[in-house]
């Protein structure tokens, strides 16, 4: 089964399923426990939450990371065995050099939030100017990135 994660949402699952999302300036925060074959993906839209929006923890880097961790541990993942990867953060709307680069801010915030919980990004496919499709295979933890005709694994 393929679980499709929408903007601002979080998806978790077990082998043999996969988790997929489409990204522009948003970032996918991906965590995977290779031994248990359990993983998850948060599709964050913005770096920092506002207290008034506590109903959407997957929308922001600062709330998505702890929520994703909690859901994975409840599913049986071992926190000390989780591998972190990120993808996305494209500069989709580069009008001028003074424009706010939401993609870059999302990348930086994702790394910062993972670091706060003791996780280091093991690999990434971030930045650029085009969107991408991200697929996490829960069988083996491979993350496949598709950008146009280009396909690669991280």
UniProtKB/Swiss-Prot annotation:
Probably deamidates glutamine residues to glutamate on methyl-accepting chemotaxis receptors (MCPs), playing an important role in chemotaxis. One of its GO terms (biological process) is chemotaxis. The keyword Hydrolase applies. SUPFAM superfamilies: CNF1/YfiH-like putative cysteine hydrolases. It comes from the Archaea. Belongs to the CheD family. The keyword Lyase does not apply. Its EC number is 3.5.1.44. Keywords: Chemotaxis, Hydrolase. It catalyses: L-glutaminyl-[protein] + H2O = L-glutamyl-[protein] + NH4(+). It comes from Methanococcus vannielii (strain ATCC 35089 / DSM 1224 / JCM 13029 / OCM 148 / SB). This is Probable chemoreceptor glutamine deamidase CheD. GO terms for molecular function: protein-glutamine glutaminase activity.
């Amino acid at each position: 089964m393929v679980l499709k994660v929408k903007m601002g949402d979080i998806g978790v699952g077990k082998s043999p399923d996969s988790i997929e999302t489409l990204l522009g300036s948003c970032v996918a925060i991906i965590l995977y426990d290779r031994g248990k074959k359990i993983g998850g993906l948060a599709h964050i839209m913005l770096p920092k939450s506002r207290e008034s929006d506590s109903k959407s923890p997957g929308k922001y880097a600062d709330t998505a990371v702890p929520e994703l961790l909690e859901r994975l541990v409840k599913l049986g993942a071992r926190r000390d065995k989780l591998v972190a990867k990120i993808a996305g953060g494209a500069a989709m709307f580069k009008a001028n050099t003074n424009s706010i680069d939401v993609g870059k801010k999302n990348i930086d915030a994702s790394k910062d939030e993972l670091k706060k919980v003791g996780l280091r990004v093991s690999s990434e496919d971030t930045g650029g100017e085009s969107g991408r499709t991200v697929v996490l295979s829960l069988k083996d933890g491979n993350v496949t990135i598709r950008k146009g005709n280009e396909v690669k694994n991280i």
